[in-house]
């Protein structure tokens, strides 16, 4: 099935829920062949001892350890999803986002906690959260002099208030820099959605981000 989907011109992303495989070598070879052609995302269930016992009871297939599976997927060039929700999210992202051509990432928006969590998630998944480069800092100083020495990557949206530079404006500056290959744009915090004008503000923010995504040659993942 993996080889068929790899050659199918109508399939852009391959995703699979796997409990175990009867032929480990055959699975690896098919996985590597497919991953060489298009994104492949695997959710391996039965990673714990209890889960593996349950999987074996109705598949009679090789389950393997979590570490072994992670290594196999990485060597084959596939991506690992930790649960079914992440599997679907990764498949959707791989289908909609163009290839970045690099791993240097800009992270904009959200409060301090959310921006820190985004940075952790990015680096834990192999991206580099590059500090704000001099070319971007110079442009920030032109637009918001008082902000230039404070802002960094990830961008804590709370420090932008009253600066004259919006998070979307800063996102555009970062995307125009050769220092970054892609970006994450965080939209809103819990308190934001409790505002009486939250719907209108959210619509405006999303429309503006859509414009940025359309005009940028670099991928932008928007997180609501």
Regions inferred by a protein language model and the residue ranges of each:
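Catalytic-core regions of core metabolic enzymes
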Residues: 1-224
């Amino acid at each position: 099935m993996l080889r068929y989907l790899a050659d199918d011109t109508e399939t852009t992303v391959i995703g699979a829920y796997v409990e175990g495989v009867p032929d480990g070598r055959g699975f690896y070879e098919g996985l590597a062949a497919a991953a060489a052609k298009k994104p492949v995302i695997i959710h391996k269930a039965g990673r714990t001892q209890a889960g593996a016992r349950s999987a074996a009871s109705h598949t009679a297939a090789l389950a393997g350890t979590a570490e072994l599976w992670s290594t196999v997927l990485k060597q084959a060039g596939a991506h690992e999803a930790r649960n079914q929700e992440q599997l679907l999210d990764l498949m959707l992202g791989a289908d909609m986002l163009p290839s970045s051509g690099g791993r240097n990432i800009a992270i904009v928006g959200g409060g301090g906690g959310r921006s820190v969590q985004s940075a952790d998630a990015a680096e834990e998944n192999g991206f580099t959260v590059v500090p704000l480069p001099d070319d971007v800092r110079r442009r920030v100083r032109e637009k918001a002099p008082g902000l230039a020495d404070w802002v960094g990557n990830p961008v804590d949206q709370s420090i932008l208030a009253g600066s004259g530079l919006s998070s979307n404006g800063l996102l555009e500056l970062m995307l125009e820099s050769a220092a970054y290959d892609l970006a994450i744009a965080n939209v809103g915090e819990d308190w934001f959605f409790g505002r009486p004008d939250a719907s209108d503000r959210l619509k405006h923010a999303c429309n503006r981000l859509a414009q940025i995504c359309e005009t940028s040659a670099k991928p932008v993942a928007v997180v609501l």
